[in-house]
């Protein structure tokens, strides 16, 4: 049996002071769980079709269930942005010196740091190549998104060259991604944010 532990009351500030902790944007904090073993590689999966205009793709990720002592997969899903102009910064797992800590995702006017993890479908480690807001409407990049143009007309097609072939799902630690926040991601960390919306919370619970 794999050795694991769940440590409660883990604060992001404390973890950042420990040796080997990856850089964390100021907007993301640990959710209170430390896990003694790394999450699995990201699986390969197909993106479902976008339901309608205004929905933003939130990629799948590994969550941890302390009751079962193991990770479980939360599928990616389309989520209606809580505000016009808001984009999703995915959460990510990062090495915290004595275990892996999860830094929760958030909504904001620009995409912040998500550990350099290549989640795919526009989230290739930094930023978001899947679409943009323009004039109060969200425009989808068809080269990386599954969009029905008979339903959604705000589309464009820009080829994105993804040179990251790794499916590693965590930052830092043994075998982890060695990436730190870029200047624009540090700026994003200081902007106004909104936590995951109720639909996202329910989606996580349904995946357990």
Task: Enumerate the predicted regions with their spans.
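Residue-level detector of alpha-helical hydrophobic segments embedded in or interacting with membranes
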Residues: 17, 34-38, 43-46, 176-178, ...
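Blade-edge beta-strand/turn elements of extracellular beta-propeller
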Residues: 71-75
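Low-complexity, repeat-rich tail regions
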Residues: 20, 79-208
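Residues embedded in well-ordered secondary-structure elements
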Residues: 16, 46-48, 77, 117
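Extended non-catalytic interaction/regulatory regions in multidomain proteins
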Residues: 22-68, 111
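Classical secretory targeting signals
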Residues: 1-28
